[in-house]
Amino acid sequence: MTLLNPYFGEFGGQFVPQILMPALRQLEEAFVNAQKDPEFQAEFTDLLKNYAGRPTALTLCQNLTAGTKTKLYLKREDLLHGGAHKTNQVLGQALLAKRMGKSEIIAETGAGQHGVATALACALLGLKCRVYMGAKDVERQSPNVFRMRLMGAEVIPVHSGSSTLKDACNEALRDWSGSYETAHYLLGTAAGPHPYPTIVREFQRMIGEETKAQILEKEGRLPDAVLACVGGGSNAIGMFADFIDDTSVRLIGIEPGGLGIESGQHGAPLKHGRLGIYFGMKSPMMQTSDGQIEESYSISAGLDFPSVGPQHAYLNSIGRADYVSITDDEALDAFKTLCRSEGIIPALESSHALAHALKMIKAEPEKEQLLVVNLSGRGDKDIFTVHDILKDRGEI
């Protein structure tokens, strides 16, 4: 029996080998108790404020929207220590690991941001850290690999399968099944077996809580829409969670359209996948005709994931949130636009959400609308990728 509901509608669950069930039970129990423990909450809040730098700013983009009637704000998770929203929930889970008496942390990472956040939390809290990363991602995210190693983490390249995030996830789970007595698997997104989707949402929900308080202070009303990119879905569920009951606020998640949905080279399982079981959960995923997990693709390593968190699947199924896709080229254009108009270099992941906001503004420039984009991370890690693409195009 679980203490919390392991499902969101029909999505979610705990599809793991029997050997891992005690570890998941222990984790759920520790989480439920920690949520009620004022000491744990005070320590977590203190780390978020004095180590990570919360609350993050809500920035009005005046140049981007000039000549339109839209007000566009960015929730600046890029300003968080570590460079992205990942730091929030990693600090929470690392504290939970210590509470459970674990001495080691296992993690998987795609863009490297979760790996960096895990490495910094482990350095801070005195935990051993090993990070599994697809060999392809090790190549395309070399600055983050070095940052992890600088902070004492062991980075393990994964050469199996497509050598990307899904393979790193598989290896991390395999490791944990043999080491869970001393190690905590610090999962990096709001997906996977219960209780991870719930834990990650709760340890990210301050994004939406702060946004709501800040926008009410600045504008005196709630936004018409909040937008966030969706890979596994942690930054998006962190933004959406506090707005779910505010039905006047549209929740818009942006999946990576890659080279175009029709090309098959994308990472948009919510709208273009089939229901299946993978990574310990039941959720939409990209599958071949015979039910094998298909490789996802995105210009941004952090969105390159073949499935999606179960709460997003549920919000999509009941029509509470809308999910759309943005191609590599559209994300790249938004990346350049923000750099040149506001002096902010966004992560390629976040650029997908920004691109859809810009589409909305362009479609109805005379419409008075108040939009908030979750700028989930900064783009320092992506400058080499963008440089190579722009060089090939002759733009630099």
Swiss-Prot record:
UniProt entry keywords in alphabetical sequence: Amino-acid biosynthesis, Aromatic amino acid biosynthesis, Lyase, Pyridoxal phosphate, Tryptophan biosynthesis
Domain of life of the source? Bacteria
Per the record, GO CC terms?
Answer: cytoplasm
Q: What Gene3D superfamilies does its record include? A: 3.40.50.1100
Gene Ontology MF terms in the entry: tryptophan synthase activity
**Biological or metabolic pathway of the protein:** Amino-acid biosynthesis; L-tryptophan biosynthesis; L-tryptophan from chorismate: step 5/5
This enzyme's EC code(s): 4.2.1.20
What is the documented function of this protein? The beta subunit is responsible for the synthesis of L-tryptophan from indole and L-serine.
Q: How does it assemble?
A: Tetramer of two alpha and two beta chains.
Q: What is this protein called?
A: Tryptophan synthase beta chain
Q: Which species?
A: Pectobacterium carotovorum subsp. carotovorum (strain PC1)
